[in-house]
From Swiss-Prot:
Residues 351-391 are annotated as: Disordered. It comes from the Eukaryota. This is Isocyanide synthase-NRPS hybrid crmA. PANTHER family: SPORE WALL MATURATION PROTEIN DIT1. Residues 352-381 have a biased composition (Low complexity). Residues 941-1019 form the Carrier domain. InterPro entries: ACP-like_sf (IPR036736), AMP-binding_CS (IPR020845), AMP-dep_synth/lig_dom (IPR000873), ANL_N_sf (IPR042099), CAT-like_dom_sf (IPR023213), Isocyanide_synthase_DIT1 (IPR007817), PP-bd_ACP (IPR009081). Residues 1293-1526 are annotated as: Transferase. It comes from Aspergillus fumigatus (strain ATCC MYA-4609 / CBS 101355 / FGSC A1100 / Af293). Residues 573-752 are annotated as: Adenylation. Induction: Expressed in copper depleted conditions via the regulation of the macA transcription factor. Its EC number is 1.-.-.-, 6.3.2.-.
Amino acid sequence: MFHKEAGISHLILDIILEHALNKFDPAPDRLQGAAKNFLPIIERFVAAGTRIEACLPAFPFKSANKVYKVLGSLPDKAEELALDRLNTMCARVREVYPPGLQVAIISDGITYNDTWAYGEALRQMAAQKQFMYIVFSRIKDLLDIPLPEQMSEIVYVANCTTFRRLLLNKYERADLDIDHEIASNPDTKLTYLGYRRFLESDLKYIFPRGAHRSAHSYKRDCKYLAKQMLIRGDAFAQAIKTSYPNHLRLSIHESVAGTKLSISLLNTKTGFTTPWHCSVAQLANGEWISAPMGEFRKDDRLELVYADGRPSHFREKPREGDAFGISESTASYLQRPKRLRASEYLGATLPSVPVSPGMSSPSAASTSSSGASMQGSAATTPETHSPPTFTWSGLEIVAEDNSNNASVPYGRRLIPQIMDSLAATEPERIVFSLATFSGDSLEFRPISARTFANAIDKTAWWLHNQVGRPDSIQPVGYIGPHDLRHVLLTYACVKAGYAALFLSPKNSTEGALAVLEATKCDLWINACDVSPVPLVKEVLQKRPMNVLQLPQLDELLDAVSTDPFPYTKKFDEAINDPFCFLHTSGTTGVPKPIPWSHGLIGTMDAVRLLPPGADGDLPPWTTDWKTGDTIYSSFPMSHGAGIIMNILMPALFNLHCVFGPAGVLPNINLVDALAVSTRIDIWSMVPSLVDELGETPAVLSKLKSSKFICASGGPVSPVSAGKVNEVIRVLNLTGTTEGLFMGNLIPPREDWFWFCFHPYSGFEFKQVEPDTYEHWVHRNEHWPLFQGIFHTFPEKQSINFKDLYVRHPTKPNLWAFKGRSDDLVTEAFITTHPAIKGCLVFGTGKPQAGLLIELKDPLQKTDELLDSIWETVQQANSMSRHKNQLLRDFVAFATPDKPFCRTDKGTVKRSATLKLYADYIERFYRSRNDDLGGTFDFDMSSAHSIEDNVRKILAASLPDVQEASADTDLFALGLDSLGVFAAIKTIRAATGLGDQIGPRHIYANPTIARLSAIIALLAAAAESASDTTLCERPVDDVGAQIARMIAQHKARQSFSLNAFDYVNPNHGMGLVLYFPIRDGVSYEQVFANLQAGLNRTFDLIPALSGKMTDCSEQGIGYTKGDLCVTIPPLAKADSARNRLVYKDLSAVLPSFDDLRKGGFAPSAFSDTLANFVSGGCILAVDLNHCCLDGLGAMVALKAWAENCRYLQGDQSATCGWYDPESFNHSLPEILHRQEGWARPLHEIDPGTWGFLPFFPPEDEETNPRCEKATEGSLPARPIFPLHPVWPLPRAERCLKTTMFLVTPEKLELLQQDVIADPATNGITPSISDIVQAFFWRAAIKARYRVATEIRKQKFSPDAVSILELPTDTRPHFSSRLPPTYMGSMLILNRTSMPIETLCSAETSIAKVALLLRQSAARITPSLVHDAFTLLQSLPGHRRFSTANMGLEHMHAMISNMLLFPTSEIGFGDAFFANGGVPETMRPQLERGNGRFRFLAVFPLRKDGGVELVLGTHREELEMLVTDEEFTRYARMVDTCC
């Protein structure tokens, strides 16, 4: 009998072990331990013939991470599969042992969180699915507390605190030292690490990071909470042991100590085993798999399945054609997790002490705790993406080294051994492709791993045979063609006992010799097939060295029969050996050598071990670098990025590197050729090439399929590179030659220009002045793996990089490079000007600093360009510590024959360039001190005398001009900007022309003849208009004054509106702008400036002070309803001034800071309330919408702002950009006719009426003109009621304003989800399309649900919802229309969709966005002009109607201000903070809430978020906030309901 019981017990244990969690290798001792620990428990039940009772603490609550992990808050298919698996296990036990097995699931969620609905739904699921072998228990069942038998949620939740308190009072051990247990008990440590990862990955969605929650404090809080959870978990374990003393103890976690049977709840090939932390998907073959929901969502081969109206799981779609199905080779989430050895995972961090018998290992964690999450074969438990903290002696994730069957941890692998291993295991894998031009096309020569490894060995033997093996590692200098020999030589040197030293050919001879001397380099290698560059020849003349001739590349690659050249060092032996040598750029002096040790390079390998960064969800920069990805780098091999991207990253990440073509400098044409000829996944580019790519859209579009571009080596232009980022993600990296890339994280796409760094990097940003921080690094415990710079400087504890950064205004962990702390910070900013190649501030020891600018095109110095550059300089001045440190007269330009000295990465060498321009700078300052004009007698009597005087003036700076002809180009003779400045200074003084002549006149007229002619012309004009000659020429002066008065009177003539103006009915366009006020500034000062600035704007644009009136019925061609603008005549202009109204509401409304903190909530105050609150100004503006559209309003505000700045002392604020014809409402009709767009009405497609807010005349509705639709014709005008009046009477029940926020992260998620949706058919909708589609669908769904669910309305299948989008037609109308034209140029882009389709769960946002994109494509110049023709033909304006008028319908209008450039509106910084730029600008919505359905998308927030505002009834709002799709992306921030 005893043997029978033992046999049955073994069978039962075997069945349970088939369901075991095996995330560590099943070591024999562990299996023996399982039998030893658990067989006696099972045998007791079997001997008694009773049912085996097991308990499993599990199923606490659904993860809070609904962005990436799970589908919702309630159990779904994942839980169902887990319960079924447990139930099936019990059923199988019953087959061999009839009493069977029952599992009691003890919901431990209450130990850590208040949960009820999840547990109740789980019980209902078990009952519905008849999982009869599973029972449930809650924590209250473990405690002796009187409660009702049938307990409600209210009673249960009300007693949560009591439950926890009783648990701790009864079972907490006073002598528990939790830190000691973590250090000594492997099970406790496993659970602790799991808790930390769970907390760090999930709590950020409950308690988002912000200004008052730093990365450090967040991590610290999570560690504290994890320990508290362990303490409660220990008490919970003791309670279970007490309540279930004889039960078989199951656990969802690995148990190193073997005290629990570890169970895998999900039987999938991935490592995701806890259903409350993942989602499941069913493949086409019926197999179930598990992974984070976010991974499934990205795979367009999967579709989301709903059950009972809630998302349940994913399902593989039917395969189409030859499309690949989902398999391990085509889906990254299916890569099997690699089992870790428990000893490797924990052993190195645990001292040799026995497991404490008193510590009951908690198993109530809500996440798996076994190891770090890794992609690919090194993954263990990828339920979170945060590997535990570890030190050099701690956790080491391992990679297989198949060459010696040893496991080598990431961060401790040696580059030569990685390649030898690859050649042995995957000899045919292509590791390099060598590009060559064949005619105009590229050809590629593939290099396999075997061929490459053989070539390395051949090169190593060649070197060894030439010079033998040195006693210690010696440098080998090399400058050669940009081909694969750089890579081969690097590897070969390491194997042969040397280290390659790559010198830049741009070094000076002095600099190169300094590096060679510092490294004691006595061995030089030249490529045998090319002549050495001049630098090498000069160096070899001054420093005798042993010179070798490196064979040609083809010879080295022909290495089939080469014997292996072994490299057998261990990492600990090689850690401090130099892998190669580079050197500093020499920007501030002679370059210095930098050895790259194997330890330093190991930090690049260890990046994959980093947990998520400062914001939790920001991944390390190498996250998306996948095996087999193709990379191309434009960096030279003498630059650190060239070594990293061509040698290190391909080896460490198994990349396929494209190299060459040799002899071709990377340029935009080569990028174009590469993009066309092969697929490049990862581009690594110098900053200048990234910028050029942004200005070359034809090439940029060809890179769209690539993953991203790594930009490094210096700052990129935020404008040009920003254009690149819109097409292909720009990964903006920063690093140092001494430390490589340390801690770079990937910020959200919209923040691509900013840097974010991982806490392990040890970076500190010390504030040195407001908005300026100095970059430091401090050694920490993670330095061996993540702080490479301390491998280079092992003696240092802290290092000042001397780089300056600016902090993101709303995201405190994001930083932007500002400059060097030992340079003036203005240089970095000024260089962002698109026309500037580089600049240097000079003048140390001088009373006034100067600026030397190197232009990209030194011959283009137009007046507009110079003004534009000066604006940038002024902005730089405002950012600097000292105001106005650069003056316009102290800006000079580099000469074409003396380009700035630069490093390989394109950075300006300051000292070398200043030395090059030393004489120039001295002449520059002399030219500012000399005053030739006071003594020069300029004869203006004739053209000849003017030319003679010009020649003499120029000769002071340009002696050769004396002998040149009058038509010789002065710049060809050598005239530079100093000479230009000196000449202009003299001419101004000698001729009396003053500022009427400037440097631009010389640049535009660069010969003596042309310059003399322009001087004569300017002098004549000055003479006729001079105010100083009133007595001498009274007639001419009166004439000029009369001309000015005529112009002013013309500008005040009343005018009628044109046909386009009536697209907007006669009503006000209300806008509200929010400005912070500087400390110490009074409301009266601000008001006076605004009032005076507005009056000055009325002088500039008199029509703004006018009044809209009805046209006279006696007028020729009068049509009823015609309107005109009447403007006060000049004599009564003062009557229209002082329009602003002063209100001090500081005692009524909250302060500006409070309003800002509340997001300027609409409910905080009425639209009618303005304008002063404590600390700020609320400026309410009302413009007539019939006379101006949105862009016209923008022009008006910009002019007002500039006039306010002028009154504050900004003499450049002259509104010179404003075209005088901007308010000429006759222009559209003139251009329409003169450009030939007018045509007969019968030729116009009747579908054009669909773009207008007017119904066709009655006779046309019954007798349409264009009966026959042709291919490509417009869709029919959508049908909606004609409203008899405008405006409609106000509804009795008005809508209430509600505001939602889509955060930057949610906006990116929305965009990603839409782009990934197959409904887009490969077309990428714009962000405006996506936001509008999202908003339209959500608003109509809410109304539809109210109508159908509450009002019980029914809709026919053909009932449609119409979306009206006011659309600016300026880009389509005429290039001759002034860009600042202010009149209305709008049409209505209408899109319609059946209501049931729009609101259906089967309709995606992507489908709606694609429809909007297709609708926008219908707008063409022909359509716009046809619309204008129809508007001109209207007999009146009484048939005005839009679909959104009224409240009881299913239509909407969206006013999309998303891309409204509020930053262009700057009211000055004398009184306003923030430069007078409004913090936000919004339309006044209250006025329309009773008359039409109006949705508004506010301008993009500074943090990249989007605010959506609409009017709702309360029941509609309730539907919105319960819409899972809508609330996935948007959250309500304010409502007036």
